[in-house]
Amino acid sequence: MTIVRVEPTREQTAVRLLLILDRLGDPCAAGDGAPPTAVRVIQAQRKLAKLDFLVRNPDYLADQIITACEQGRLTKERLLDARAVLEEREPELHTYRMLRNRHGAYEPMNNALAVLRHPGLIQVVRAGKSSDTHVRRRDYYLLAAGAEFAQRLRTEVPVLAWYDQQILYVRMVAEGMSAEELKALQYEHAEYAGTPVGQMIAGISERVRARLAAALEREGLA
């Protein structure tokens, strides 16, 4: 039976978001309207949340790897990465389910982001306004100090290697995708789409295990 810890700590979330920005953020420069020392950016909280969802939910990530292999976007050998994500990398110790809001997977990030903002590791910039009271989106910039700190964490805190590798798996299937594209992929799952707003999004581990076993058998990788 899979044991899922429902809620990560503020500090765990902060470190995870820092590594996501470092590995999955788009390169940027001051000439792009970015803060002076910015090196990477993820535009819109929705995209950051969708990427975080894949890091936190190994079953959904493994399923995306299988889909990418079946569509020819990844080689069949990458099915072995799906197996590693789902079965070999202690997913039960690293699964943190997320709530669903009207835009999909969501968790309040302000407290964790504050941990990164106050020492000058990231900067959150409001981009445009849809009205006098509503901001169109928030962009999340990784500053040079944040990139240096992320590298230091990799060197000094070996246990974080799990998250770093997980984020690289996410990059493999999600690089270049917009928030809307990620949302559409996640909504293909009945468990995800059918979760009422405000409720925890259900897991799909057993279904993905069956799908993975069939794919490995079909490709001669079992």
Q: What residue ranges belong to the model's regions?
A:
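Short, amphipathic alpha-helical interface elements at domain boundaries
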Residues: 1-91, 100
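C-terminal/domain-terminus segments
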Residues: 8, 35-38, 129-152
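Alpha-helical scaffold segments in carbohydrate-active enzymes
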Residues: 50-57, 115-118, 145
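Short amphipathic alpha-helical interaction segments
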Residues: 101-118
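A short, conserved structural fragment
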Residues: 113-129
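Short, amphipathic alpha-helical interaction segments positioned at domain boundaries
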Residues: 138-192
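Long, low-complexity, charge-rich intrinsically disordered regions
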Residues: 172, 184-222
